[in-house]
């Protein structure tokens, strides 16, 4: 057993005046399965990069283990999967049985080994690189959002695999995934970083309890401060009046009145000191309370009960049929989750519904004059200012920015080019645009990819409150269970 010690860590990016971390201190055991959580833009990936030695910083990070980062960058994807395994893991060819064992645990068929790495699916690449990195000796793995390219079955397999391992930091926003495979939580809060024993759910329960206590204390202290201020004002006003009566009075009167005024002034000073102490107590509170402000949505009712009908629909990639027999009816008020393995045509079906040219056969009936709000998976097109994006999208810029602020955007973020945003922040931009749009149907393609847990909960609350008609693809098991009124399972056509 060894530890990773972080002492007085301070860091900001070159050219920035805002510290990402300031005098941060904590200790990690290298045997822990540590979940790393926090809102988008708080510095999770930055901290992993600091551990890797990619940036200069103030303070110290000491460790007796070697850090490896996932996702690992493969520079030559023409190499076979087997060659990548050997190169990344550093194991000898006679030990290759160990690699095959790891792949078996991750549900990867050995038939992928002779294939060029470039031909593997994103899910297969994720699993192969995880296996390779865990085969390395005396390393501590920094795993940055491994679930983004995994379907639900893949997430369950990887969670089970990670649960069997020791010694890693895992950045993920998938609650069910975290609960399955971690035993400690490292949380970047609004003003502190904390480490606790337990999984995500135990951290969330403790966080909720503490936030509720601090809100209650804040309300109590606010009322106490108001009472003290009123009392201090009354005493000061009385003292001023008494001082005024001394003018023109006799010597005895002035002496008696002066003594009373002095006593009241001492009392006022005591009240003032107590007031300052109560204010300090209040200021010490609420530093880490997350403000998960309620979002709003404006779904437009459709004039018919039925919005969509799919019957025996088949989706093609070129000449290859990837899915067939897709049948479902979307009625007003339904929230249908499309569920299936990666590559089975879920995203293509959504693109087909918004009018993109997707090869297909079968019956697809779409209601006339149906207005749709669409959140795509792809975010690579986002660049320029948020103001220009809002104008191009024909949405209210004030409402757009208000929603982003509620999703934890800082005001300074709006001065940046969107190409500089984190992946989570880019996804929030697309979600905020959708929330600004009045629509009969909301079609969202993996809306929670890269989105932090607190924002996910805000979005869940929004949907359950406003009950929009939705068709969506999402691999977050907790979200699907909470939100979907129906599930349409799409099978991959082998």
What are these regions (language model features)?
Residues 2-4, 213-321:
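Flexible nucleotide-interacting loop at or near the entrance of a catalytic core
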